[in-house]
Amino acid sequence: MSNLELAPSVMRFYGETVNEDSRLRSSADGRMELVRTQELLRRFLPPAPARVLDVGGGTGIHAEWLVKDGYEVCLVDPVPRHVEAASAVCPAVVGDARDLPEPDDTFDVVQLLGPLYHLPDPADRQRALAEASRVAKPGGLVAAAAINRYASLFEHVTYAHLHTERIHNSVSKILETAVYDGSRGFTLSYFHRAEELVTELGASGLENVRVFGIEGPAWSLVKAAEQQPGEGPTDELIASAMDAARMAEPYPELLAASSHLLAVGTVPVGSAGRRP
């Protein structure tokens, strides 16, 4: 087990406060995030049965569909209750993205669909990406998700309270600093710009880095509809928002409107035994 520890507020948030599994299954924008993440990853995944390391994999919500697709999945997460739940899906251990308990050149795919969210120190993010690159095989895939720099701006409009002084000031600080201190509601978090994510993956030695908007530019319309009295967003609205996410992919200027970003890159061939 790693001696590194996440910020106590992050551990409390995921260990005691929030159910990350239900977030991606119950809310409309959460379901969009889950389906689009599957859709994007399946474009780049090698054929099953390849070996996948799910770093920060939570309760195994992504491991679950990967196992069903025929992949051999191992999961690492810092939160013990997540690991306990994920163990019903695949082998799972407590560990930290910055110090993975795995040998070099072991996995065909390493995915970090959460760890970068809660590492505001760039040195920590670089260490996590370097570890992902280390344990991936030459030619292997590394995929990393990030919260978009502007996500909170769109989100708090959907709740119709961005104009209140406290929320306005809080979101303004996130836009200025890219960091939320976790003082209320959400926990300590970092918010990426797309070009920054490309730079960070490249600095870890990855090649052919590409970034996608996961939910696309219309997710906040779906979330706003869900806040209104009644039955929530229609299937037609969700389908249109999903189509908008796909249509937006060729246009990098639309990345800033997505709630989350997904970056993919490959480990250079001939780099066995490296440690960035």
Q: Predicted regions span which residues?
A:
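Conserved class I S-adenosyl-L-methionine
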Residues: 1-48, 61, 65, 85, 141-174
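C-terminal lobe and adjacent flexible extensions of AdoMet/dcAdoMet transferase-like proteins
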Residues: 204, 210-276
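Short alpha-helix
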Residues: 188-205, 211
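A short glycine-rich, Lys/Arg-flanked "PGG" loop and its adjoining helix->strand segment in the class I
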Residues: 126-141
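A short acidic, Gly/Pro-enriched loop at the edge of an enzyme's catalytic core
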Residues: 98-110
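A short SAM/SAH-binding and catalytic strip from SAM-dependent methyltransferases
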Residues: 109-123
